Each structure stands twice: as C-alpha cells, then as structure tokens.
C-alpha cells in the first residue's frame, strides 16, 4: 500500500465521485476472478464460453457453466470492500458506481446509483422476443432454459465482441469525463471499453486512485496505487472506523449524510464469505 493517501481530503472536497470495479472486489467473497492465479480464464477458454459464437454452437455447454457460477455466487455475500463502496455512495453528493461485475453483490451491499457495464448474471434475455427478465432459479431446472414464448434464453451479460448496453456506457463515460475523484478497485484494466474510463477521468482532471493486489496498466497513470486486498485496504483508505478486533464498523453515521438523501439504509456487518 502507498505510504500516504490524499484520498480522504480529495473526497471531502469532491462533488462527483466515480468508482470502477472488477472481479477483484468480489474475490474475498469467494467469487473467482477471470485473470491471474485461480482465474476462470486459466481453466476455461473465453472463446468456448463467453462469445455469441460459443453460445450459438453449444448453448447447453455455456448454460452449464453459467449455472455452476450462479450456484456458487448465490452462496456469496458482499465483503468489506463492497460495504465500503456502499457507504461511499451515501457520502458523496453525486456518485456513480461503474461495475464490470455481473454477480449482483454491489446491489446487495446497498449501492443504488450503479451501472452494470457487462450485464447481470441474474437476468436472462430471450433470443426470440428480446424480453429481459430476472431469473433467480438455482440450480436451473432446465438447461438451456426457455422463454414462455418458446425462445432460447441467454444470460443477460456482455460477451467478447458484443456491444455494451449503450445507456450504461454513456452514463459511465459522461461521469468519467466530469468527476472529481475516480476510484478503481479490483480490475486488471485490460478489457475495453471499461479500461479506458480511468484514463478519460485522469485527462479531464480527476484524482485517480487504484486498489489492486498487483500493478496494472493503470498504475503508472494513477495518482495513488495501493497494493493488497480490497476488503482490507479500501475501508482503511476511506477512514471507516474499526472496533478493537479490527472489524470495520459499516454504519451510515460514520459518514456525513447528504441532507436530501432518501435512499434505503446500508446493510450492517458483512456476513461470512462463501468458499470458492
Ligand atoms: C484483487 C483481489 C483482491 C484479485 N483485492 N484486487 C480495443 C483494443 C483491444 C481489444 C478491444 C478493444 N475494444 C474492444 C476490444 C475487444 C474486447 C477486449 O477488450 N479484449 C481485451 C481482453 C483485449 N472487448 C470486447 O469485446 C467488449 N465489447 C466491445 O468492445 O464491443 C465493441 C462493439 C461495439 C459495437 C458493436 C459490437 C461490438 C466486450 C467485453 C465483454 C467482457 N465480458 C466479460 C464476461 C462477462 C460475463 C461473465 O461474467 O461471464 O466480462 S470477460 C471478463 O473480463 C468479465 C469482466 O467483467 C471483464 C474484466 O475483468 P476484471 O473484472 O478486470 O477481472 P480480472 O480477472 O481481469 O482482474 C481482476 C483483478 O483483481 C486483477 O487485477 C487482480 O490482481 C485483482 N484482485 N483479488 C484487490 N482481493
């Protein structure tokens, strides 16, 4: 971790705060990352599972993979990094969480102002009638699942070679161009177009802070880069108090609330993460 940090001072002065997250933020909840040791792409080929061509070739195989990931993620809980980001949303006058994660854990932690650039594992999308619906069935009773209209359903996620949801990408780009602080947590910063957002923010004058286990292509460009586990580093960086045993106290009262805030309360102490 960098010896000193100006993040708290910058946040105190900031009007618009953006956070970009990747798989590393959920790693300590027990959700596997994609790249690096233990990453999904070490075990599976993205071309076989995460492209539209792979799905058309073998929807059953792709759905079996997604079903097994949904089963694992269904047992996972947000960790201290998710909770810290949820508290940050309550503190910032204007805030946007831009996540590449499809696991839904940020929402579970209490974030409301968020865009999911790569979709969500708990939604399905009918290839025939185009309807997008929530689907929480774990495990799936039929693989591949079908829509009421008889059409083939696919996970409502973004695969390689596919366009990101245009409204989500536009909102993320607009916020990156105009924010005062841009925090980047647990992403390898290699998958485009998400990987360009911190650079856009930096060029437009934002204070850019990265938290990651290891250096990334962003490290040399960021104002601060902190290396270690997000669930340990992020609450400390944000000044969230901890008790005598070192457990962070995730209470809204630990932050000054914007006066007009009417959002739901942030959930309390994190639950135990599941085993991967
Ligand atoms: C911790 C930690 C702890 C671990 N604490 N840290 C320009 C140049 C080159 C290529 C392209 C380009 N533009 C587009 C492309 C192609 C491609 C791309 O970027 N490829 C690169 C890999 C080279 N991009 C696309 O295809 C995108 N589409 C697109 O651009 O379309 C254009 C278009 C326009 C109009 C019409 C048609 C097309 C789509 C990208 C979709 C990505 N999809 C996936 C799968 C989602 C569904 C699913 O989950 O199954 O999204 S791939 C995967 O990577 C997933 C992630 O969201 C994404 C990013 O990964 P992330 O989150 O960064 O995870 P990791 O594993 O890479 O990194 C984890 C990090 O955490 C590491 O750094 C660890 O060190 C760290 N860490 N534990 C802190 N405890």
Residue positions per predicted region:
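Short, basic, low-complexity termini and linkers enriched in Ser/Thr/Gly/Pro
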Residues: 240, 245-269
